[in-house]
């Protein structure tokens, strides 16, 4: 949301009114979710009104999930961990931190975030459930099972 330039997109910070956000940027997401029911959406690198989109719980949970009825999984843009805080992103509702990692880049901070209460275990479970639901949906579709 609010990332409409390629140059310096990891440093872009959009400041805009609620009206502009909803009428210009969010309207296309609302239509896409209503018409196409996407399996996933991706947060951008940029910040919007002071919050990195990957960390924006109000945007992910309040607008996309509650208002627009989005039921798929949310993923970060590629290598967003150098922009957004992993713990805040998971708590906001990011289900998949792309591209993933074979080291401790994600795992240790997430475990510690659960232990110290910065990540609600219910939210983490919900994030995993969103991914598994789409995996199951795709497998069933591939097998021709309803």
Language-model features and meaning:
Residues 1-146:
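Glycoside hydrolase catalytic-domain context in secreted enzymes
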């Amino acid at each position: 949301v609010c990332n409409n330039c390629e140059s310096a997109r990891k440093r872009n910070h959009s400041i805009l009114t609620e009206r502009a956000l909803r009428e210009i940027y969010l309207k296309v997401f609302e239509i896409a979710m209503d018409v196409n029911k996407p399996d996933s959406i991706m947060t951008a690198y940029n910040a919007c009104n002071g919050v990195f989109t990957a960390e924006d719980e109000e945007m992910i949970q309040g607008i996309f999930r509650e208002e627009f009825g989005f039921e798929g999984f949310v993923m970060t843009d590629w290598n967003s961990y150098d922009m957004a805080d992993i713990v805040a992103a998971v708590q906001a509702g990011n289900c998949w931190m792309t591209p993933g990692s074979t080291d401790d880049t994600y795992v240790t901070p997430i475990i510690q975030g659960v232990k110290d209460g910065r990540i609600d275990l219910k939210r983490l479970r919900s994030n995993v459930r969103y991914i598994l639901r789409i995996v199951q949906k795709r497998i069933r579709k591939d097998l021709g099972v309803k």
